[in-house]
UniProtKB/Swiss-Prot annotation:
Keywords: Heme, Iron, Metal-binding, Monooxygenase, Oxidoreductase. The gene is CYP78A1. This is Cytochrome P450 78A1. Residues 84-104 are annotated as: Disordered. Shoot apex.
Amino acid sequence: MAMASAACSCTDGTWWVYALPALLGSDTLCAHPALLAGLIFLATVSVALLAWATSPGGPAWTNGRGASASLLSWDPVVCPCSAASSRCPGAAAPRPRRDGPRRRPRAKELMAFSVGDTPAVVSSCPATAREVLAHPSFADRPVKRSARELMFARAIGFAPNGEYWRRLRRVASTHLFSPRRVASHEPGRQGDAEAMLRSIAAEQSASGAVALRPHLQAAALNNIMGSVFGTRYDVTSGAGAAEAEHLKSMVREGFELLGAFNWSDHLPWLAHLYDPSNVTRRCAALVPRVQTFVRGVIDEHRRRRQNSAALNDNADFVDVLLSLEGDEKLGDDDMVAILWEMVFRGTDTTALLTEWCMAELVRHPAVQARVRAEVDAAVGAGGCPTDADVARMPYLQAVVKETLRAHPPGPLLSWARLATADVPLCNGMVVPAGTTAMVNMWAITHDAAVWADPDAFAPERFLPSEGGADVDVRGVDLRLAPFGAGRRVCPGKNLGLTTVGLWVARLVHAFQWALPDGAAAVCLDEVLKLSLEMKTPLVAAAIPRTA
């Protein structure tokens, strides 16, 4: 019935084709049989194209795909270019339809739609999302053209499921992001925080307010550079500032290319005809710059290791990769891809999440005061919070979790999954092989059936001592899984959470944060690029507590 109704509705738009014979007259048509044949052909093609484009789920679900997915809920408003807007740079974050579950209860579990020739499903239900993220047939990711050309197909994020990817995952969990390795880099995180606090104090003194994001991005860049390459930049000096700006420009270009919507990913025949973002040309220009930079760092570390091959606890990622032997040993091309991905993924995500935290603390002075009191109780007014201190601050941890709930960095868990086989789900639905699957984490974290009063910023919801839930955000509980779950969970999640927690503690401990003079409110409008960003970067008054 759904297929029939869709077909009926699509023919309504072709009325003009059938009206043409009446307008032209029978004599004209009889005298020109070629014109009559052309009109019949035009009418047939018009009906076929519209039926194809407006079929349940959209055009990608034709050609038999829909037969194996007959229990899916179809998006009734999909057309060939539907869903593109939510993936375009600068698009608003995907919002759930508040009345969707009431009108179409199964749509929340799994909704089918099309992006060009790509069949896709999206889940806004924690139980179904867990199946999508944890099922072994969803262990692959669809590789965008930009990701492939930027070498990410050989890195942890996009490498296909197989022996090579399993080796990368083992190296990441055992060597790069182990608890001991994360702890060993704390002095670097503290140093980056100190430099950030000094630059914030200087801008506050000079301008009376602080644009926070550039300070966070500079600190995040140095932090990830220290962890990955063992290098930090003095951005106040000419040489250091120039090299840091060069690296930032490469990271920024990579973010734009990977976050840009490219129609050739979904209509391959457009690859050489339509590339409005110049993805191919820009990737071809960026890759040699990245290779030159990263290979130079690898060569320098290799020369250094000739004198001392010993690997200490605070070794950077390059040294760790160079120390691998046997089956774990990697070639230079693979190391370039892995190291570049680490820099790329670890820079803006940390900065943007910290900015969201601080924006909410500016909006909620009582929450900020409670965080500050918790930090002061741990280290005193003149102390310096450490990673160990932050781990014992339940309210600060709750603030970070609530920020992740209110503003999930990847609202559509941006890097989707690809079904490598037909996947039957517990609810009776079947996701066919070749389908791209996504989880709408924004919809889940703002669903009143999952979270009480979801539009309120309430860290207490994560405090068991105050009636809240002790939710693990590292992929265990799909009510809040901002780093993904299953085999493709983000390997750097612990490093990211540790860094954000420490920096929020340092920022609140050093400054009283408030709206600058003349500002009415913090703007929480969102923009979806590769991550969910504040559309208007936070500007606040950072009043030193010693003043």
